[in-house]
Amino acid sequence: MSQWNSAEWADLCSGAACPICRQGKPDGIVLELATSYLTSSINAPMRGYCCVVLKRHAVELHELSDEEAVAFTRDVQRVSRAIHELTRPVKLNYEIHGNTIPHLHMHLYPRHRGDPFEGRAIDPKLIKVSPYQVNEFANFVAELRARMSAG
């Protein structure tokens, strides 16, 4: 039986077994926003990576009310602006999957010349080492918080 046909998958989608809902908040919170949490990780697949995680449980964007969808998109826009200002990427990728954890969240990947996936899709499983040097991640988080608080 595939994962998507299992009772476990149904429990994840309903929120009953959602790991984010069960612990109350996602890991790696940088900042609490209007409808979401801004998260990141020292073990991110690339420098400047962030994830915007909806506070309440929903699996799909269409499950949000119009007001929630606008507010979530506004949160993502604010985060993307701050990431762009901090990292000056060639391109900023936005990804919503939910295949592993069906709780609405959007990954933001700043893309740079020479990044490990230049010109192709990102595969986080291929990254085995943190992209950050000592103190670099803490500095990124502090700068990101400052930019988000200012704007």
What spans do the regions from the language model cover?
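HIT superfamily nucleotide-processing domains
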Residues: M1-G151
